[in-house]
Amino acid sequence: VIETPGRDATDIIAEAVPAIIRGFHWPKSMRWGTGDLRWVRPLQRIVCVLDGKVVPFEVDGISSGDETEGHRVHGRGPFKVTFRKNYESQLSGAGHVKLTRDARREVILAGIEKVCAEAGLEWIEDKGLLEEVVGL
């Protein structure tokens, strides 16, 4: 029998997440600043919380934490992520960001319908364009 002592989950996460971030392949990626990290967009914050406590680590000069921001124009600035179960509502409320494609599609379609109704216009559906906008 070989017995291996268990490791603390915080230590495992602090080791694994930076490796996952650095190893994640994006078909189109960019570098910014003086770092070497390539990512789909400039990485500004890394939220990593376990049992209400920040799991500390760093990736390319970015330290993990418990704060995030929403939309850069419409959001209300940084806010603490309290629980995973209400992260989506926090991001939507304080951040003015819809986390899922379905939620974004719903908001976009409602906006299209409202503008068309007010202007007496008819929207000619273009699913490809809609999906592109949902992905922005």
Protein language model annotation of sequence segments:
Residues V1-L136:
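Long, basic N-terminal domains or extensions that often function
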